[in-house]
C-alpha cells in the first residue's frame, strides 16, 4: 500500500478542520475532535500542526490569498451588473471561510497574527470598494461626491464584514448551514449594493432592482 505524502495529509487536515470550524464554530472544535474526524492519532496531527493556532493561521493564509486575488477584480467593475457579480463572489468566498466571521472578535482577541492581518484585510476591502466606485463613476453608473466616497466605502465594508454575523444572530441554529448559503449570500450582496441606491443613475437603479428580484425568485 502506497503511503500518502505528508503534504497531502497536511492539506486533508486543513480541509477537515475548515469543515468542522464552519459547522460548529472554532471555539467548539478541539484538536482531539479534528484527529478523530480524520481517523489519525493526535500525534500525527501535532506533527503537521503543533498548535491549534497554526491550523487557524494556515486557513487564514489560504483565505487571504484568495481574497486579495478576488479584490484585484474590482478595477474591472463598470456598472451594476459587474458590481452585483463582484459582491456575490466576495460573499461566496467569505461563506467558504465563514467561521472567521462567525467567531471574529473571539479569534482576534486570542491571535495576534490574525489581529494584524485582518486589519490589512479591511484596508484591502476598502481599497477595492473605492476602486469599484471610481470605475462606476467614470462610466456614469453612479454619481457620488468625492467627499462621500470614503464613508460610503466604509459602510459597504462594514456590511461585507459583519453580514454573516448578523445572519447568525438572527437564526443561530440554521443561518450558517450549507442549505441556507444561497439566500444568505443574496441578502448580503443586496444590502451592500443598496448603499449605492442614492447614487445610482436611474437605469442602473432599475437594473439593480431587476437583478435582486430575479435572484430572489431563483433562490426560493
PLM features: residue spans?
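Helix-turn-helix
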Residues: 12, 20-58
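Short, Lys/Arg-enriched anionic-surface-contact patches
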Residues: 2-10
